[in-house]
Amino acid sequence: MAINAQEISALIKKQIENFQPNFDVTETGVVTYIGDGIARARGLDNAMSGELLEFSNGAFGMAQNLESNDVGIIILGEFSTIREGDVVKRTGKIMEVPVGEALIGRVVNPLGQPVDGLGDIATTGFRPVEAVAPGVMQRKSVSEPLQTGLKAIDALVPIGRGQRELIIGDRQTGKTSVAIDAILNQKGQDMICIYVAIGQKESTVRTQVETLRRYGALDYTIVVTASASQPSPLLFIAPYAGVAMAEEFMYQGKHVLIVYDDLSKQAVAYRELSLLLRRPPGREAYPGDVFYLHSRLLERSAKVSDDLGGGSITALPFIETQAGDISAYIATNVISITDGQIFLQESLFNSGIRPAIDAGSSVSRVGGSAQIKAMKKVAGTLRLDLASYRELEAFTQFGSDLDAATQAKLNRGRRTVEILKQPLHKPLPVEKQVVILYALTHGFLDDVPVNDILAFEEALYDYFDMHYSHLFETIRTTKDLPEEKDLDDAIKAFKDQANFN
């Protein structure tokens, strides 16, 4: 049998042309140190800052310290099975989280994995956890109100869509309750809410989730949780994961409310990571970039321009103070970043004034532009009235005789304090807030005993719902007050048939 050299040559050439190389080139390194959620690895010379790295046990890490001879890595998950000498490889991808509507109604960890036992989440999109905030020309000024349903906030420290309003106070002063009530009040307001629980007890998070479910608020809410028992890298990354999920909706032209509960615990987790990564400590052992930790997070909340869809992210970050000290390091940092703060005072809370908002120390830098006309008219003098009442109340401790004008101010002040009280998880629509504040500022409550104020308020709402619902409708649709005569007549008619004098 003759061998045809040309055929063999053609066959070999064809095989060479059709050859598909089947191999992967990955840059790998070796773990040189492991402990406390931190790893160090040699050999990853081209790793990027914030890059996702994969360990041989399947766990993922994030490159943080890029040094001349090794890389400092924070481990996002189980690290007890990682050993020195294990292989760690680059993925070539920056840390991302799943985003999209499929997350709504679910409880997830900072990596976007479900922790509520309701099965997998069919998300299709991803966004990087670290992203550049919208620039100056990509933003619009805050002009639309975000109604929290709490009279003390909507009247005294109004919040607008796209604003960052800090909620600050000692532990157990009702910070979480304020945020949960604000989420409950977004029902039917075309708003998506994200509640980020950082370093909370798992039982506490479960309670908040059940509250949201009971009031039907979980239908438009995503809960991101990094509990106290989880490694500090997850606590550090949780707020960034939450805001990445929010940005997806914002750039689709939707409105988002995001609650960070609380950033003090994130700062402590970041301090822990930084010290373990051997970064130089600064004041109170926090690293030098702890301001940037929070500023780059909160700057991502904005009201974006119409060219970008006109969506918004409104942020309610929490800071926990020690003994009411709002001049502490992290507290002053976040106060300077945000557009105002709501200060909750322990003494007010313990004396039964809830929400325990200190009107003197609380401020909204957006102010009246985030209020409807009707609220602006009825709440205009409320803050001054409250401040002068507090001042006069301090003087009356000395028991001096009071003239009629001073007595009238004190009486009005006591009724103002009562009106601003509100039961837990009972947010009020803005039209009801406007009517009761109108009744207060126009003297209709001056002859009602202080102990009967809350009963008077409930009865007034019921009476208006039955007989004057068109006045509520007018406020809701026009955002302005109805004719003063109509309101006066309606309140007088209620007082004539009710026995509160």
From Swiss-Prot:
Which subcellular locations apply to this protein? Cell membrane
Q: Name one GO cellular component term.
A: plasma membrane
Write the record's keywords in alphabetical order, separated by commas: ATP synthesis, ATP-binding, Cell membrane, CF(1), Hydrogen ion transport, Ion transport, Membrane, Nucleotide-binding, Translocase, Transport
GO MF annotation terms: ADP binding; ATP binding; proton-transporting ATP synthase activity, rotational mechanism
Q: Topology in the membrane?
A: Peripheral membrane protein
Q: Where is this site: Required for activity?
A: S362
What reaction(s) does this enzyme catalyze? ATP + H2O + 4 H(+)(in) = ADP + phosphate + 5 H(+)(out)
Give the protein's biological function: Produces ATP from ADP in the presence of a proton gradient across the membrane. The alpha chain is a regulatory subunit.
| Binding partners and assembly | F-type ATPases have 2 components, CF(1) - the catalytic core - and CF(0) - the membrane proton channel. CF(1) has five subunits: alpha(3), beta(3), gamma(1), delta(1), epsilon(1). CF(0) has three main subunits: a(1), b(2) and c(9-12). The alpha and beta chains form an alternating ring which encloses part of the gamma chain. CF(1) is attached to CF(0) by a central stalk formed by the gamma and epsilon chains, while a peripheral stalk is formed by the delta and b chains.
Instruction: Please give the family membership noted in the entry.
Output: Belongs to the ATPase alpha/beta chains family.
Extract the NCBIfam families matched here: atpA, PRK13343.1
Query: This protein is called what?
Result: ATP synthase subunit alpha
Q: What is the lineage of its organism?
A: Bacteria, Bacillati, Bacillota, Bacilli, Lactobacillales
